[in-house]
Amino acid sequence: MQLLNLGLLLLLPFVAGEIAPQPEPLRAGPSDIVPGQYIVTLKEGLASAQIREHKKWVSSVHQANLDSFAAGASGVETVGIMKNFHIHNLNMYSGGFDDKTAEDLRRSPDVKSVHPDQHVYLAKTVTQPQARWGLGYMSSKGMPVPLHSTLVDYLYDDKAGEGVWAYVLDTGINVDHIEFEDRGILGHNAIPNKPHTDEFEHGTYVAGIIAGKTYGVAKKANVVSAKAFDTGSSTYNYILETYDWIVKNITDSNRKNKAVINLSISGAKYQPFDDAVENAFKAGITAVVAAGNDGKDAKNNTPASSPNAITVGAVRWENTRPSLASNYGKIVDIWAPGELIKSCWKGGNNATSTQSGTSAASPHVAGLVAYLMSLENLPSPSAVTARVLNLTIPNLVKDAKDSPNRVVYNGIQERKFTLPKNTK
């Protein structure tokens, strides 16, 4: 049985000025599995005609099993194939199947894997007053900055992500928040019978760190809401649908070199979604992902373990891992601000909140990617990753454990760009 399924990362509250103790990570028990629902991954290299024939076969096998005694064994109502996903060379589908059909699928020569779908849980978020150190850290070469100071300068080129799109797979975004001006876009809502609004606040907070006019790293980037979570849970059925939509939208809009996906989500390793992130990379699309908040090696987390995503750990203002225990390990590519970070919030079009977690660290780096894309010709995700890592400042994190020890930096003090009169 796998551990907790992919969920939004914990944004931790503060109580009496201190970080609230983090609850033990949830473990996936039988109740986390969606009964009778599966994610099926097909083998690479199948022709379109083979895929069509496979799905016809699935429909016939499913119907035959429904008509048999075996179909009722699980006591679960089944519906057959539900949704189809195509990300670069990866073909997948979700479906509701009885136990016999699921076993038949596993034996099919066309099928790479059959995974039970799983519930995805949202972590609770509550509030702590103010902090503004994170942006100053981005341009300070990793030097410790005053925690509550509003005087820390954030230096950046005023192109600031202009002409770049940041896709936020999350709980939705309040695109009417004043921080987004006219740059917020409602993209895709995978949650049935729910409005395309942020009812949980996580997505709006993340988007504000990427592109808010006050709190954002890339203050002129567009943010696209891709809602895969509601106020309590989701499943990979919705997450894969949303990721599939994002990849298609980026591709169809000819934005591959001007788009970044932020995934402030984490859970136990789940290969179908890691495969989706990897195939989007092969298609030319950059993803930035959170390392997770379990205080463990991130190699066992999805999507942190996706080999070509940019995996982000969280640091405090004095270059230590937060007391909320950011994940670590060789899979962590970079460290970014992740404690006491102020950004947009729900509850009004000018609402703000201060939160902590690798959910906050990941959008700092996604914002940096958008910023660099607006300034430089970065022709591929590999070039983006190389540029981000080449700018990092080494050997500053005091407790990086087995992780590469490099913190985020936007390169402004070296005047890597032609910008003197455009610098803010």
UniProtKB/Swiss-Prot annotation:
Subcellular localization, as worded in the UniProt entry: Secreted
Disulphide bridges: none
Signal peptide: 1-17
A Pfam family assignment: Inhibitor_I9
Active site residues of this protein: D170 (charge relay system), H202 (charge relay system), S359 (charge relay system)
Propeptide residues per the UniProt entry: 18-123
Organism: Arthroderma otae
Principal cellular location given in the protein's record: secreted
Occurrences of domain Peptidase S8 (ranges): 132-424
Keywords recorded for this protein, A-Z: Glycoprotein, Hydrolase, Protease, Secreted, Serine protease, Signal, Virulence, Zymogen
Glycosites: N249, N262, N350, N390
Domain of life: Eukaryota
Family: Belongs to the peptidase S8 family.
InterPro entries (alphabetical): PCSK9_ProteinaseK-like, Peptidase_S8/S53_dom, Peptidase_S8/S53_dom_sf, Peptidase_S8_Asp-AS, Peptidase_S8_His-AS, Peptidase_S8_Ser-AS, Peptidase_S8_subtilisin-like, Peptidase_S8_subtilisin-rel
Enzyme nomenclature, EC number: 3.4.21.-
Record protein name field: Subtilisin-like protease 2
Any Gene Ontology CC annotation: extracellular region
SUPFAM superfamilies: Subtilisin-like (SSF52743)
Record GO terms (molecular function): serine-type endopeptidase activity
